[in-house]
Amino acid sequence: MNANPKFLSADARVDAAAVAPLPNSRKVYVTGSQPDIRVPMREITQADTPTSFGGEKNPPIYVYDTSGPYTDPDAKIDIRAGLPALRQRWIDARGDTETLSGLTSDYGRERAADPATAELRFPGLHRHPRRAKAGKNVTQMHYARQGIITPEMEYIAIRENQRRAEYLESLKASGPNGAKLAAMMGRQHAGQAFGAAAFGANAPAEITPEFVRDEVARGRAIIPANINHPETEPMIIGRNFLVKINANIGNSAVTSSIGEEVDKMTWAIRWGGDTVMDLSTGKHIHETREWIIRNSPVPIGTVPIYQALEKVNGKAEDLTWEIFRDTLIEQAEQGVDYFTIHAGVRLQYVPLTANRMTGIVSRGGSIMAKWCLAHHKESFLYEHFEEICEIMKAYDVSFSLGDGLRPGSIYDANDEAQLGELKTLGELTQIAWKHDVQVMIEGPGHVPMQLIKENMDLQLDWCKEAPFYTLGPLTTDIAPGYDHITSGIGAAMIGWFGTAMLCYVTPKEHLGLPNKDDVKEGIITYKLAAHAADLAKGHPGAQVRDNALSKARFEFRWQDQFNLGLDPDKAREFHDETLPKDSAKVAHFCSMCGPHFCSMKITQDVREFAAQQGVSENDALKKGMEVKAVEFVKSGSEIYHRQ
């Protein structure tokens, strides 16, 4: 795809690379209590254990799948029509929304009537936007606080469990050693939670719809699901659930197009992006967002102040509450699931950034700081926060309360400006919760490792356990081009301490707009960080995939090693650089150690020797050492021998 209007309107096609199933994988669905609750997962087929290792059956592994219908061969993908409205029946059945006659935002109507944008517009939307009926609240938090378990909550419970119980049962039924195998493959190290992060961290062995409801009701988790984005597959963000990751996409004034951004979205979700933020600041922001939302099975977030700034030609001092309010309604009617709103950037905090090394690095934060200084007034976002809540609950848009004063260098970490804003975000959370509006809190930024836990502990305390959503944090500032790694270190740590969602950083951070390859690199890095955090927390079932891959590695099932990994393509590519032949896929060594120094091959030889001698492995090792000792003495007890 590209930015050519005729091409977009007439010939837009999905990226072929995003629709092919991953190797040895297929889409499966688990049905809930009603037929239209069909929860997708990715089933990874495994080969049987070779007879030389015992000849066991290895049943499929089920993993969390964010790719939506794109990797389902039975689905018809037409990005000009968009995805099926998965949640529409559930929304209709609640009877608390009304269909509007058309768009109600001034800007939305203006764009719809502009002939210059006609060929750019998404052509497949034939339904009108919805809004809560007068006096109604349509948020998932409101339903949860009424004791209601919505279809979205049941869907999430099934999704979070990843068919773990069925997998262990299939192991038990795999043969005479099934029970032992199930115990081995289900084994998991105990996690560790400590300090403030331990408070309220209590994921049960099995996630139930009731548990989902209770966590949402308490504000400890959110379900971002705008009623105008029925295409989204329900997911949850909370520290008692799997750690999630977000991928940022979006055009700029100098690069990218609508088509490239849609491709980035489908690419990001293929590799595991749980949500996507459209941070477009260039041309056609409204149209770009429509294409993305209509084709996205994951929640979409935005920073509305970016588009509001475009409406006043980039002059922050010309922004008004009325322009911003119209932008919120415009985006809510399109279906944006969560808004980053920098309402914590208050006039009193701006001078606190004067002595920083890197000042204010948040785009949204700098916009609001400039407005506050230009007018010497309190931020209109802060002053009108109650009115913003009224808009949010009419569409079920979640808050992502922005950290506009986050540190942009480790020099500035945990300073007075950052922590002052965090306290304000805690106060705003309480206001939003009075309206039953869902909230998560955005966090830094650049923070050295020894200061990361303080961020988490203060957030849990001041923000009353609302989910934390952090950008990294980056743990050092010396590696431009490698900031996916500097931040991945901090992301794994803060995820362990209790952060619910990690915002990815790509290798292009601080350097340029990421392309598709950068998006994938960032996603894989952050999937790794999130998974490491799940393991450290002892999240139920987190170790199942590790155990399966380790078993495949020990049994030299190379294809299973590749396919069980986060990036099968790269694993296979690296292996084949030195051992490309098919015969190498069954070899009992790789190019790292070769056939004579493979530690796993040596272990297998010990086991075979023990079986032949009818002794234990320890006895076999002892006996082998005794034989070698005799040989050493007979050879003259010389450590080194001349050849």
UniProtKB/Swiss-Prot annotation:
Binds 1 [4Fe-4S] cluster per subunit. The cluster is coordinated with 3 cysteines and an exchangeable S-adenosyl-L-methionine. Its cofactor is [4Fe-4S] cluster. One of its GO terms (molecular function) is carbon-carbon lyase activity. It catalyses: 5-amino-1-(5-phospho-beta-D-ribosyl)imidazole + S-adenosyl-L-methionine = 4-amino-2-methyl-5-(phosphooxymethyl)pyrimidine + CO + 5'-deoxyadenosine + formate + L-methionine + 3 H(+). [4Fe-4S] cluster binds at C590, C593, C598. It comes from the Bacteria. Pathway: Cofactor biosynthesis; thiamine diphosphate biosynthesis. Keywords: 4Fe-4S, Iron, Iron-sulfur, Lyase, Metal-binding, S-adenosyl-L-methionine, Thiamine biosynthesis, Zinc. Substrate binds at N248, M277, Y306, H342, S362, R363, G364, D403, G404, L405, R406, E442, Y469. GO terms for biological process: thiamine biosynthetic process; thiamine diphosphate biosynthetic process. It is an enzyme of class 4 (lyase). GO terms for cellular component: cytosol. Zn(2+) binds at H446, H510. Its EC number is 4.1.99.17. The keyword DNA damage does not apply. InterPro entries: ThiC, ThiC-associated_dom, ThiC/Bza_core_dom, ThiC/BzaA/B. The keyword S-adenosyl-L-methionine applies. Homodimer. PANTHER family: PHOSPHOMETHYLPYRIMIDINE SYNTHASE, CHLOROPLASTIC, THIAMINE BIOSYNTHESIS PROTEIN THIC. HAMAP family: ThiC. Catalyzes the synthesis of the hydroxymethylpyrimidine phosphate (HMP-P) moiety of thiamine from aminoimidazole ribotide (AIR) in a radical S-adenosyl-L-methionine (SAM)-dependent reaction. Belongs to the ThiC family. This is Phosphomethylpyrimidine synthase. It comes from Burkholderia mallei (strain ATCC 23344). The lineage of its organism: Bacteria, Pseudomonadati, Pseudomonadota, Betaproteobacteria, Burkholderiales.
